[in-house]
């Protein structure tokens, strides 16, 4: 291994991390780095924003500029700490030996990817539905979505699970895969930190309306290209998955519905998935007891059924392999060009 170039070692570690996630998911015996990133974000949230007094709940009485600046400080600290610690781990590991470096990089790469976690959690929903337990299905889907699940019927639960797999295929699989392929664990973990900040403080609610601006906009920028690559992978791979999928319809629905979301990225993969499966996703949903109006994505060519969760997972798996193969081919091309 000592005679191998850093790029060759990176390719080996990247491949091993992908296989590890595919085989077992996140190593549960080791503390998950995303958990620690989340704790850092929560700590900085308390220190920088703190409790909002009742006399400042009125938007007109709050200092928007100051809150935005504090949010930007949080983003810079989290990114700096994440990148620095990851770089330190990689430097120390490769200093010990190439093998130690490859192992550390493979484990971190596995942590970045969520294909197995998405499949495992969404299939829990599927099994509860097949057993006729709507309450169990609601509880299972509540683990992976932010909406109120107690008001969902079986179709609503199924749609929520399919939407989650479709949307998280981008920010949970392809985006970290692309960033890890380009910049190794340092860039990959930095992306995961950005994504985690958005999921924790990137909301347009009373608390984070301005404090979360930097996190939300950075996440939009970081996911802009990966979300579109993810959608194209779903469209292309739907042609490989059998008669239950329609690539032409996936492309048509994607072109029509890809911007039917407040986020510039979220509907990219949802529209491709809806078209591939021939179902209608999105629509109004309840969050914290309030109905949020959302446009429908896709055409209702048939009723949504529990098997659509299985179909979505199959499409995600094939598309993940395709994304991985493209990354390896790109790295191989760079390696060949450097010789």
Task: Walk through the language-model features, giving the residues of each.
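Hydrophobic alpha-helical transmembrane segments
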Residues: 1-190, 194, 202-339
């Amino acid at each position: 291994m000592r005679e191998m170039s850093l790029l060759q070692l990176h390719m080996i570690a990247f491949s091993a991390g992908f296989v590890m996630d595919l085989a077992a998911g996140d190593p549960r015996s080791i503390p998950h780095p995303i958990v620690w990133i989340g704790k850092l974000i929560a700590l900085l949230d308390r220190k920088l924003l703190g409790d909002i007094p009742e006399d400042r709940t009125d938007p007109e009485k709050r200092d928007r500029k100051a809150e935005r600046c504090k949010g930007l400080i949080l983003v810079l600290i989290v990114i700096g700490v994440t990148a620095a610690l990851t770089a330190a781990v990689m430097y120390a590991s490769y200093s010990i030996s190439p093998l130690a470096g490859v192992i550390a990089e493979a484990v971190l790469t596995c942590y970045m990817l969520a294909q197995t976690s998405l499949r495992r959690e969404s299939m829990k929903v599927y099994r509860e539905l097949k057993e006729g337990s709507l309450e169990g299905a609601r509880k299972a889907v509540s683990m992976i979505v932010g909406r109120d699940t107690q008001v969902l019927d079986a179709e609503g639960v199924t749609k929520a699970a399919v939407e989650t797999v479709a949307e998280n295929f981008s920010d949970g699989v392809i985006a970290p895969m692309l960033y890890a392929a380009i910049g190794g664990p340092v860039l990959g973990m930095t992306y995961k930190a950005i994504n985690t900040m958005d999921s924790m403080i990137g909301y347009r609610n009373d608390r984070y309306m301005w404090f979360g601006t930097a996190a939300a906009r950075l996440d939009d920028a970081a996911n802009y290209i990966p979300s579109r690559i993810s959608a194209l992978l779903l469209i292309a791979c739907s042609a490989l998955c059998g008669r239950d999928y329609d690539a032409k319809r996936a492309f048509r629905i994607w072109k029509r519905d890809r911007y039917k979301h407040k986020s510039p990225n979220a509907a990219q993969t949802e529209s491709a998935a809806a078209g591939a499966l021939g179902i209608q996703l999105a629509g109004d949903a309840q969050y914290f007891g309030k109905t949020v109006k959302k446009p429908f994505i896709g055409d209702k060519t048939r009723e949504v059924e529990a098997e659509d969760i299985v179909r979505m997972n199959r499409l995600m798996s094939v598309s993940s392999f395709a994304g991985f193969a493209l990354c390896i081919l790109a790295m191989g091309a760079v390696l060949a060009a450097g010789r």
